Amino acid sequence: MKRVLAFALSVVSLGVYAQAPAESEDIMLQGFYWNSQRQTGWTQLTDQAADIAKSFNLIWLPPSASAEGGGAVGGNNMGYHPRQWNNQTSCWGTAEQLKTLISTLHNSNVKVIADIVVNHRAGDTGWGNFTKDDFGTYGSYQLTTDHICSNDEMNTTPSAGSWYGTAKGAKDTGENWDGARDLDHTSTYVQQDIEAYLNWLHGEYGYDGWRYDFCKGYNGKYVGLFNEATQPYLSVGEYWDGSYDPVAAWIVATGKQSMAFDFPAKYAALNNGLAKNNFSNMSWIEDKTTWRPAGMIHHHNYNRYSVTFVDNHDTYRDSNKYTGNVQAAYAFILSSPGIPCVFYPHWAGADRDAINQMIAIRRQAGVHSESNVTVTARSQYYESHAVGHHGTLITRIGAAAPTTVPEGYTLVASGAQWQMFLPTELAAVHAVTASDNALRVNAQNGQLTINNPQGHTFQVFDTDGRLLHQSSTTCCTLSLPAAPYVVKSGKEVKKVSVR
C-alpha cells in the first residue's frame, strides 16, 4: 500500500508542474506576426518545418479556430475573436492543412503550442447566438446568453439592440474585453466546454500545449483548472503587465500550473534598459544579495515559469516595440533563465544567422530555464555568467564592454555590441556555428534527441567508449539513463548529459 501511495503521490506531483518543465532547455519560435497569413499560413510553415527544427523545439501558432471577420483562408483576420471552436478552418489554412503542419513538425521533434482564446467569443449572426460546439466523443455544448458575464457590454450598452440586458451569467472575474462577449468562467458548463475544446485540440489535431490569450480577463485559477483537465506539455499565459508582483500573483493563482510571458523583463531590461543604453535597468537584485537578469527571471521562485521575448505580434506594432539593437536583445534573453521565445520577423530577417548562432551556443552550454545567472557588470555595460548543464556561458552587451577574453574561455560569437564566451574545453568539443547543416544534440527529461540534417552516420557512446547506437537518420530520439554520453558524426563530436 505504501508503495502504491508513493507512486500516486509522485504522479500528482509531476502533474502539478508538468506545464512548466523543470530546468527546460526548450526554445520557442512565435511562428506568426500580425496579418502574416500569406507568409506563415499552415502550408508556408509546413515548407519551413525542417529549418525551424534546426533551432527550435517549440512553436507557438496563431489562433486556429474559425473567427469573426469571415475567416477566409489568406484573409486579414487574426482569429482573436473566435466564432466556432470546433471549426479549425481559418484564415491560416484548412483543418487538414493544420493537421499536416502539426504532423510535419512532430516528425522533426518540434512541439506545437496552440493560441487559446477563451476569455471571450463572437456570436454567429448576432451578439449572443453562439454556434454549437460539437467535439464528437469529447462532448457537445451549446453556449447561450446564460453563459455571458452579467457586466458584459451586452447589458451595459444600448447599442446591443434586442440583445440588450439578456446576459445572465455571473460578474466577470477579470477585466472586460469589449470586442466580443465575455464568457462566465465561474459556470461549470463553460468550464466543461473549454476543457472539451482543449482535449479535442490535443486528441484530434495533436497540439502539445497552450498559450492563453488575454489572461487579465478572468481569474488565473481557471487556467489551473483547464490545465489539470488537459495536462499540456507546456502552458503560458499572456498576463500583460510590466510589474513583477501582478505577474507573480497570476502564476500563483494558477496553482503554479502555468508559465507567463515575462513582460517585466521586456519592459525593464529591454525597452527601458538596453534600448536606452541604461544597463543598470537590465538587472534586479534577488533577495537583497545577488544581481540577476531583470524580470520574472531574476528570482528563483519564478524563472521556471517565465517565457522571455523581445517582441510579439502585438508589441511590435505600437509604442511597446523594442527599438534597440535586436541582436543584443537576443543575446540577453538567450543567456538568461526562462524559456526564450523568438519572434518570427526577427528570425526570418537579417538577424537570422546571429540568432541561430546564439541558440546553438545556449544549447552548447546547456543554459536552461532555471539556470543560475549572475550579473557581474551593470553600469557601463552588461555582463552575465549563466551556469548551464554543460558549462558557464559569459555574455557581454554594450559598446563599452571589454574585448579581452576571460581566462579559460574562448570567444565563440560576437556582433555589434554583444559577445559570447564558452569555456575553452567546451568550445573545443564542437565549433559553435550558425550552419544549417550542423549536428544538433539536445538532452532533456531522460531523452537524447539528435538532429542530423546531412544524414551522415552518427554514433552514440557512453563514457567508457561502448557503442550504444548507430544510425544515419536525420532525426532520432533515444530514451537513456541519466549519464554523460558522446555523440560522433564524422569530425563532429559532442558531449552531452542526459538528466
Specify the residue positions occupied by each region the protein language model found.
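A short alpha/beta connector and helix-capping loop motif
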Residues: 125-148, 223-238
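Substrate-binding cleft of carbohydrate-active enzyme catalytic domains
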Residues: 93-126, 130-134
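Positively charged n-region of N-terminal signal peptides that target proteins for export
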Residues: 1-4, 499
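Aromatic- and acidic-residue-enriched carbohydrate-binding clefts of CAZyme catalytic domains
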Residues: 24-26, 67-103, 134-184
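Active-site-proximal helices and loops of the catalytic beta/alpha 8
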Residues: 20-34, 44-53, 63-65, 70-81, ...
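Hydrophobic h-region of N-terminal signal peptides that target proteins for export
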Residues: 8-18
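Alpha-helical scaffold elements lining the catalytic groove of polysaccharide deacetylases
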Residues: 161, 185-197
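C-terminal outer-membrane/trafficking sorting elements
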Residues: 430-499
